């Protein structure tokens, strides 16, 4: 009880200090979720509290789940890591350019931010704004609010973070399977891992919408236009909870350990968590060496910040989600407070 009280006090103090409306976290240890809690308000105006069941936007952590979907299609041979993705794209093609004359955009390079593709991230669309199709996003045509997604560096020559690359991947997955992206993710990632409080959706189903937090800016003010929609779902479109992110991490760790019925083969799980270039694996980023090696991804959408961090060798980890934009130091303070109390 004393430990719980101390953690509560520490996190509530951080909420007050940094004008955070709310936060939620889940801790992983011993192959299970050992703790999941919520603090503050999901919607301060209506005094709706954050609980362990509150949904937040995962933002760029979406990329890790998208990467898992792609690797699940590699296993049966529907995709391969090192072929030219233009061979599989049907609805849209990567335009010819001087940059892809000798090197190609491959799935491996898309997953590890080595494809030479522009557009770091996406601003999203406030309630009432017209939503572009994915093709309009790829071409940078109205009502899309991003530049055209193009190769503007030779693939394989430099790691450069690219939400645009994951948007190409979204189109690739849809073309290869013939399924809407949200349905595909439900079928081959969310449902198999038991992520029942998660959805890749621009409009949440009613059962989940009522649990969704309201996003806020760095000053704790509600985001104008409400939670933004992200048609670039592969890069930024996941709504979820820390507990569901923890289940995802457990699924990857089970695959790494070769557990029966795991979501991936051990070989693909190892490849996913192996640095390809810079800090990037196939989806997650990797830091540290040996027993200290960790895989992680952070996320920021308008009004939401998040972090998923897992130790490769021990499987210990944590997922943190907030309904306000804060700097990375605040997330680190939250991480340290949780780590100090939970080990």
Where are the language model's segments positioned?
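Recognition helices and adjacent regulatory flanks at domain boundaries
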Residues: 127-136, 143-153, 157-161, 168-179, ...
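A generic structural signal for nonpolar/aromatic side chains embedded in well-ordered alpha-helices
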Residues: 110-111, 137-138, 146, 272
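Active-site helix/loop module of the DD-peptidase/beta-lactamase fold
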Residues: 8, 57-61, 73-123, 171, ...
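Catalytic loop of the DD-peptidase/beta-lactamase superfamily, centered on the K-T-G motif
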Residues: 1-38, 53, 122, 127-131, ...
